[in-house]
Amino acid sequence: MSEIVKIKALEVLDSRGNPTIQVEVHTISGAYGKALVPSGASTGSREALELRDESTKYKDNWYASKGVQKAVDNVNNKIADLLIGQNVLDQRNIDNIMIEADGTENKSKFGANAILGVSLAAAHAGANFLQIPLYRYIGGINANMLPLPMLNVINGGEHASNTIDFQEFMIMPMGAKTFKESLQMANKVFHNLAKLLKKAGHGTQVGDEGGFAPNLKNHEEVLDFLMQAIEVAGFVASTSKEKGIAIAIDAASSELYDQSTGKYTFKKLKQAIKTKQPGFENVEKTKLDFTSDELIAYYGELISKYPIISIEDGFAESDWQGFAKFTKIYGEKLQIVGDDLTVTNSKILERAIKEKSMNSILVKLNQIGSLSETLDTINMAHKAGFSAVISHRSGETEDTTIADLAVALNTGQIKTGSLSRTDRIAKYNRLLEIEDQLEEAAVFPGKKAFWNLKNR
């Protein structure tokens, strides 16, 4: 009764209006699952391949080279033939069949988007067949921890058309007692931040992930606004105090790195100063270029002045030495997250563990391309004493799988955007629903989400 009888893929749109793939998996019993695959803008070079159409093919496709008709065809005409008749409850077998048939290191034959769509839809179908929630299906009876959210309130980098080079500035309501309370705290800060930006003459347009995207003079000004918003909202900017709200940064430094010079450049700020954009005419003596050691010193200044608890991709994906040195200095009191560095790949994570390049891994399902491989990576991270942060992508959909995944694996942290844009809110609403379902069994980690930091 749990045999797969039908797999159907469809080209749909993500939150940026770009094509992505939706997959349905149906069983003989009538149970079925559906999944939509996200897409990133700031991507690591070692990520599994997201298959897009060549502009010369699929001429009836309005989306040209951004289309995913080839991935859709691979699901409907190749992967479906491989999986019809398979037991939907055997997730690892389903994933292994696809991975082996693809036969490439980066899933370039079928496309990671095609394989992941089927993998996640199969998991949803399995949960539906057993009539249990997805988090229970994946995590079993121990799945009961809601994640501490990283809420992206100011966007920059590749996610916004503004003057801010670091990609994300986030708040983490560490002093909350429940997930519901963490959202309430974040909501208050978010709306007070909007008022403060408006009062200072800045726009409150939002970036890809729902955070505000103002033109500010430097990263310190961004952090000053966050500190004000936290205080005006009635909370304490702190990594440890009662009702404390901490700050997290995603620098996305691969986008700032010049391989030929070995330096990091604040490109957007440099352009704003060079072209004398309004408000930047008199900006002088601003350091714009950094070696790895200088960037470590810069982060050190920020950490000493602001309650920063987490920095993601502080260095480029090729700068293993920079990551390791930074971790050696700050790794006992700061969460140092690898995203582009490790791309949810257990083989690369193995090197990061050996070289002590970080103490936390960002987990993005589409970086590796299957549920089973994602679970393997998280298990490896936890065994090594690393925390794991479940993450969305900048090009999202209404799919809420990552919310269930965070609870299923008790990761304790999730990064899924701001408190605007339905594609982001959908995940928060799903987590509120899960917390309500778990009732008294629900656990919220708060400060304990950083269990592996000795000197926080």
From Swiss-Prot:
The keyword Iron does not apply. Pathway: Carbohydrate degradation; glycolysis; pyruvate from D-glyceraldehyde 3-phosphate: step 4/5. (2R)-2-phosphoglycerate binds at residues 167, 364, 393-394, 415. This is Enolase. Its EC number is 4.2.1.11. Binds a second Mg(2+) ion via substrate during catalysis. It is found in: Cytoplasm; Secreted; Cell surface.
